[in-house]
Amino acid sequence: MEAVERIGRIIEPSVEAMGYELVRVQLSGGQRPTLQIMAERSDGAAMTVEDCADISRAVSALLDVEDPLPGAYTLEVSSPGIDRPLTRLKDFERFAGFEARLETKAPVDGRKRFRGFLAGIEDDAVRLALPVEKKARKGAKAAPTRDAADAGEAGDAEATLVVIPFGLVLKAKLELTDELLTAAAAEQGAAPGTEGGAMEVEEDARPARRPHQPKPKKAKKKGPGRFSKAGAGEDVDGADGGPAAGPGAQDE
């Protein structure tokens, strides 16, 4: 976690100066870890492969100088996608009304996992409207409904509105729903790829060191055999660098 936070501090000023915003920095893997940089455009436009490539080059240059990760690693730059993670407080306000899943570091109202509709923010806390409970057939689960968010805003007793301090949020992500797809298509003209999709650039930021390969030994020249004819002289190297077989060379 310390390495991730340090990397974020190193690259964020340059990324923002280029017209982008950091969404998430994540490090995964073992001996050769993958450093994932997730970013979006500050102007709200859709990310392109060229955007990801520009960020990748800038980040690579910074990390080569600062060297926050020992050894070899793979750098991956991607766009958030539609079913994006919610990592900043403003994300919960921006996507108010859409369905999301959320997990907390400690129990809130006796639970750690929530699924409901984002209802904005309150100071430094996230407001989440849980589904309106409706009678269902025996054995069937009640599906979330967008009415929960509307009811939560209106203070309807049927909706359960939970307020979660942002500092307790472990991870959160939008649910891929028809409403979200429609909104994304209307905003950008066409639905972009989901998280980890086409808007992604990978490169070996620090290639692994290749094992040393010993140089091939040059074959030694052989002298004339015991029974070579007089005047045969020395063997001459062949065109391929190896010794040419003379008429009096002794077979081995």
UniProtKB/Swiss-Prot annotation:
Function as written in the Swiss-Prot or TrEMBL entry: Required for maturation of 30S ribosomal subunits.
Main location: cytoplasm
Assigned protein family: Belongs to the RimP family.
UniProt cross-references to Pfam families, sorted A to Z: DUF150_C, RimP_N
Localization per Swiss-Prot or TrEMBL: Cytoplasm
Keywords: Cytoplasm, Ribosome biogenesis
Name assigned to this protein: Ribosome maturation factor RimP
Cytoplasm found in the keyword field: yes
Annotated stretches, region: Disordered: 188-252
Gene3D superfamilies in alphabetical order: Ribosome maturation factor RimP, C-terminal domain (2.30.30.180), RimP-like superfamily, N-terminal (3.30.300.70)
Highest taxon, organism lineage: Bacteria
Coiled-coil segments: none
Composition bias type Basic residues, residue spans: 208-224
Keyword Cytoplasm included in the entry's annotation: yes
Cellular component terms per the entry's GO annotation: cytosol
SUPFAM superfamilies assigned: YhbC-like, C-terminal domain, YhbC-like, N-terminal domain
